[in-house]
Amino acid sequence: MENIDPKDIQELIDRTRIYDVLTRYCRALDRCDVDLMRSVYWDDARDDHGVFNGGAQEFAEFIIREIQQWFEVTMHAIMNVHMELDDKTACTESYLFAYHKVRGDREKVEEIFGSKYLSQFDWSKVDGIPHVFYYGGRYVDRLEKREGEWKIAHRQVVMDWNHNEISSGIFDEGMFKTLTLRGARGHSDPVFKNLID
């Protein structure tokens, strides 16, 4: 049997812990959990997110407030994650796919999407109908390991593409009416009933 270098084992542990930080961020966004969001960043971390550029702890409060104000539901997922790391620092590029459902009032839709998007609709027919946008991009992060714990020290968000349209979501007809367990923000989401304390 081949001898396994303890450094290789430690690298696997570090990669797993870094990935956990990245996925906790997505959960924090979609469950609107400010405390969980803060927990993925160091106190002196920065987030350059486009709509916000500054201290990451302040960003946590800002982004959760914005999500609650503008969106009925969001879902963020990371896919391919490329990591380069040493003992104390990691640089990651995480491919991102996100879904956002925007409340259908004209003012909100215009603020999110802009007047060019708005002009393509007869608002007498679509007023009140939610709109959605799909977003593809990347989180480019520098994480640091301090006292054995990995957290984000700096995050940049890169947008690669987006797609926007009127929502065609169905919840009360066909097979969808039988799917009665629904996601929710905060601790009323079904996942919290299954968590191990």
Language-model regions: role of each:
Residues 157-164, 169-197:
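A hydrophobic membrane-anchoring alpha-helix module
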Residues 16, 72-74, 132-134:
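Transmembrane beta-barrel outer-membrane domains
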Residues 1-27, 31, 39:
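Short, low-complexity N-terminal intrinsically disordered segments enriched in polar/charged residues
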Residues 91-93, 124-127, 136-173:
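Short beta-strand edge/turn micro-motifs at domain boundaries
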Residues 76-79, 135-139:
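Short beta-strand or tight-loop elements
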Residues 29, 41, 96-98, 156-159:
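Short beta-strand segments enriched in hydrophobic/aromatic residues
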Residues 101-132, 181-186:
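Mixed-charge, low-complexity intrinsically disordered segments
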Residues 34-118:
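A solvent-exposed, acidic/Ser-Thr-rich amphipathic alpha-helical stretch
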